[in-house]
Every structure is written in structure tokens, then in C-alpha cells.
A protein has these predicted regions:
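Active-site recognition of the HExxH zinc-binding catalytic motif
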Residues: 89, 218-238, 260, 370
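Short pre-active-site segment immediately N-terminal to the catalytic Zn-binding motif
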Residues: 156, 208-227
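Post-HExxH zinc-binding segment in Zn-dependent metallohydrolases
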Residues: 251-280, 296, 370
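C-terminal, non-catalytic "cap/extension" segments appended to globular domains
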Residues: 139, 227, 235, 273, ...
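Active-site metal-coordination segments of metallo-dependent hydrolases
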Residues: 247-259, 293-296, 323, 360-367
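Catalytic zinc-binding patch centered on the HExxH motif and its immediate surroundings
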Residues: 154-156, 189-209
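A metal-dependent hydrolase signature that marks the N-terminal structural subdomain at the beginning
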Residues: 93-94, 100-175, 409-411
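His/Asp/Glu-rich acidic catalytic environments and adjacent acidic regulatory segments
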Residues: 1-106, 110, 114, 167-168, ...
Length: 477
């Protein structure tokens, strides 16, 4: 049955990678050729306004040519899920899809509703900052991927990226660094950028062997975070497969992005430390945290999740969807989130054609769910490392009793910090989380690291943290 049941996703992939070809176009007398990868990795954030907008128009015009077959494939998929939900006795397609994730409906709805309400004004503030920095007469949806500092150029070789990642993630333990070394040395990673190559970055788990990573390394410093992200999946895979039997190897979809996003944030905080007092470099790192890590997981995928929810509501009522209706739903979601801060271009309403995630049930919302736990964990790991570093420095100047006094002073100075003796405890808890695989449901798994996802507290704290990043970026700009 697999070829039949998987046909919608295969049709989507064949259309995207086999039939979607972008014609050359000219800007300022120069002929530009473009692929899916070069649009998403280069032209979408191009600082030349004319080139960026023309690339977007060409990109979405080509997507529009395939919108009906893509919509038909997607409608087939969601209808299939609804039929299966009914046959299995579920009261809704939501209950059916969330059962596999082992989370109640309220966690799913809360993730979407709270972010749409609380994060929207923060991101609108960021959009206005971009508009001011670039001197744009109007801020459009084609401008949202712009870098905050267009003249800050930071390139890195693949070998240098490997060194940065091993150094930055050393907080997770010596054997974790050894795993990272194996990934680079034994060529687990396909990093070359090639025509026809699948877009994005992915990690494939192979039980009993090792993971494989697909990426397109473009020698930009932000690729360090992307590689760290995928290596987060790889590290979780290695630890899970060594601790769990085959049937328990798969972590709930709700939690699957936590290991990856935690790695991203650890790396970005590592880069912040290296920036030191250099305000411009600090601004660049903070902008990467916002525009890459949080924008990707809390905005791009969350807006997709809000769109998906509307589609499944229609399907649950016995309806179906076509290309025009899908674009209309997406426009409404974009408009609700960005308000009057951003003009929504027609092409952006075709964003529903860009992701394969929709063929994997309620996947998109889990990026923000995973990053919520990831943020809480990364902050604790970084705090434990910082306090341990202070105590280690103090140990060279004081006797044992004085060391204890310093540790107590550090602990009382910041309630979020843990003492040096707790650093290993924090890391051990996180390693237990990574090793759990599918042996625990998400609520119990989050509890391993002291995060209670039955409340909105972790989510609201994460949104507040994002807000603090935007505030500092405004101050530094």
C-alpha cells in the first residue's frame, strides 16, 4: 500500500524537483539564473531591491504554473488522512494525527493561538526595524528575509565551520564532540550545492549504522547554525539508538525539533561570546538568532501550522480545497500575523507550495514546540556553563571555603543560573532527554529537563526572550 498512500507526496516532489524550472531573467542588464536552492539561500535575502523583488516574481510565477497539480496532491493527502481517521474511529482528523504524537489537542491549539497573538506584535516591530534600516517606502512580504546588517560579510570554510561547531557544542560532553568529529571525518554530511538537489537540510536516521545529513553549505557564517541544527538531530539519533530498542527509536514528532534547535541556540550563544564587546558583531549574531532560528521555527513554520489548521477544519467538515482556496487561507494567515506592518504580495500567498512538511500531518507546529523546549534547555545549559566558568576562575584565587562562597554568590545573583556542581546535572538531564527516544510521551520527556509543557509558561517565556532580542536589535541599530 505504501506506493499508493505515499503518492501525494511523491507527486508533489516530482512536480517541485522535476517540472519546476525557473527561466533566466535580467536585472540591470545582467542575466540571472536561479534554482530553488539559490532563491531560498541567496536571492530571497538579496540586498539589491530590484533583484530581490524580480527574483521573487519569477520564482512565484513558476510556482503558480504548477499550483493546481500541487493543490490536488495536497487535497488528496488530507482527504486520505480524514478517511483514515474515520475508519479508525477518531472524532476528528486532529485527534487522529495528534494521537501518534501523544499530545492533547489543547497543546496543539495553544501553540498556534499564543504565538499568533503574542509574537505577532514583536515581529511587526522587527519588520518596521528592517524597513527603517533599508529605507524602504513600504515593507512587503518579499523583504522579510533581509539581513539586518547588509554590509556585514562573514564567510567561513566547511573545515572552519566544523571546528566552530565542535568547540561550541563541547558543553555537551567529550563523547558528543567525538560523535561530531566522526560526522565530519567519515562524511556523514552531503554539503555540496548542486542543481536539482533537494532544498533545505535534513537528517536521516539509520538504526544500527549512523545518521546521514543533507545540506547545501554556502560558506556563510549562518550555515554554522544550520549544520549544528542537523547535527542536533544526528546526536539525538546516535544517543537514542544506543539506548533504545528499534521500536522505541522514534521521538514524538512534538519533540523532534528540540535537540536540533537547542544546538542552534548553543552555537549562537557561543558566537555571541566570541563577539565580546564588538557591538556590530553582536548585532549580527542576534539578528541571525532572530532571522534564522526564531523566524524559521516560530514564524515560517508556525504560519504554516495556522494555515494547516484551517485546511483540516475544512476537511473535518466534509469539504475539500483547491489552489485558490489554499492561497486565500494563506493570505488571511499572513495578514492576521503581520497586520499593517507588512504588505502581503500575491506571490507570498503561494508559500503553501514550498514545503513538503504538509504531507507529514501536523508537523509544522512542532518546530515552535520543539524550540520552546530547546530555548529553555539552551538557556539552562549556557547558564550552567557560565556559572561553572566563574567558579573555575575563582578556584585559582581562593581556597576551598572561598570557592563555596563564590558559588553561593553566583547562585543568588541570578535565579536562572545553577552552580558549578549542577553543570553536569543539567547536561546529564539533557542527555537523558536525547536518549529517551519514543520511550516517553512529550509531557514526561519535557519533565526530564524540568520543563512543564502542560502550561503556557515555557512558551510565554520563550516569546519574551524573542522580544528581548528584538529590543536589543532596535537599541543597537
Amino acid at each position: 500500500m505504501a506506493p499508493t498512500l505515499n503518492a501525494p507526496e511523491q507527486i508533489y516532489a516530482d512536480s517541485k524537483f522535476g517540472d519546476t524550472v525557473f527561466p533566466p531573467f535580467s536585472v540591470d542588464g545582467k542575466t540571472i539564473t536561479m534554482t530553488y536552492n539559490t532563491f531560498e539561500n541567496r536571492y530571497e535575502a538579496e540586498t539589491n531591491h530590484a533583484l530581490r523583488h524580480q527574483a521573487a516574481e519569477v520564482f512565484y510565477a513558476e510556482l503558480a504554473r504548477h499550483r493546481h497539480v500541487t493543490a490536488s496532491a495536497y487535497n488528496s493527502r488530507v482527504q486520505q488522512e480524514k478517511i483514515e481517521a474515520t475508519l479508525r474511529g477518531y472524532d476528528s482528523v486532529f485527534s487522529f494525527l495528534l494521537a501518534d504524537q501523544e499530545v492533547p489537542r489543547e497543546l496543539y491549539d495553544r501553540q498556534i493561538d499564543v504565538i499568533m497573538q503574542d509574537l505577532a506584535p514583536i515581529m511587526q516591530k522587527y519588520a518596521r526595524l528592517l524597513q527603517r534600516v533599508y529605507g524602504l517606502s513600504s515593507m512587503t512580504s518579499y523583504d522579510l528575509k533581509l539581513e539586518l546588517d547588509p554590509s556585514f560579510v562573514s564567510t567561513i570554510s566547511y573545515t572552519e565551520a566544523a571546528t566552530y561547531i565542535k568547540d561550541g557544542l563541547s558543553i555537551l560532553g567529550e563523547d558528543y564532540v567525538q560523535m561530531l568529529s566522526r560526522a565530519f571525518d567519515e562524511r556523514w554530511i552531503d554539503y555540496a550545492e548542486n542543481v536539482g538537489k533537494c532544498t533545505g537540510a535534513f537528517c536521516a536516521e539509520v538504526y544500527g549504522v549512523h545518521p546521514y545529513i543533507l545540506s547545501s553549505f554556502n560558506h556563510r557564517m549562518d550555515e554554522v547554525a544550520t549544520l549544528a541544527h542537523e547535527l542536533g538531530h544526528a546526536g539525538q539519533s546516535v544517543l537514542t539508538c544506543s539506548a533504545q530498542p528499534y521500536l522505541n527509536k522514534e521521538m514524538s514528532l512534538y519533540m523532534v525539533e528540540s535537540p536540533s534547535t537547542t544546538n542552534e541556540l548553543i552555537m549562537e550563544n557561543y558566537l555571541l561570546q566570541k563577539a565580546g564587546d564588538n557591538k556590530r558583531e553582536r548585532r549580527w549574531v542576534l539578528s541571525q538568532m532572530l532571522s534564522k532560528t526564531y523566524y524559521h521555527n516560530f514564524v515560517t513554520h508556525l504560519l504554516e501550522a495556522a494555515y494547516q489548521r484551517e485546511v483540516y477544519r475544512i476537511v473535518d467538515r466534509g469539504g475539500s480545497v483547491d489552489a485558490d482556496e489554499l492561497s486565500g487561507i494563506y493570505r488571511d494567515v499572513l495578514t492576521r500575523f503581520w497586520g499593517d506592518a507588512v504588505e502581503i504580495k500575491d506571490g507570498s500567498t503561494l508559500t503553501w507550495m514550498r514545503q513538503p512538511h504538509y504531507y507529514n500531518g501536523l508537523y509544522s507546529y512542532t518546530y515552535s514546540a520543539g524550540l520552546t523546549v530547546g530555548t529553555q534547555m539552551a538557556l539552562r545549559l549556557m547558564a550552567s556553563s557560565e556559572v561553572a566558568g566563574k567558579a573555575d576562575a575563582a578556584s585559582g584565587k581562593a581556597c576551598g571555603s572561598k570557592q563555596n562562597e563564590v558559588g553561593q554568590n553566583d547562585r543568588s545573583a541570578d535565579e536562572n543560573h545553577v552552580g558549578v556542581s549542577d553543570r553536569q546535572t543539567v547536561v546529564h538531564a539533557w542527555r537523558s532527554f536525547l536518549s529517551a527516544g519514543g520511550s516517553l510521551d512529550p509531557i514526561a520527556q519535557a519533565a526530564l529537563v524540568g520543563v512543564d509543557i502542560t502550561t503556557d509558561k515555557p512558551l510565554k517565556e520563550t516569546i519574551a526572550y524573542i522580544g528581548s532580542i528584538v529590543d536589543e536589535l532596535v537599541e543597537l541599530s
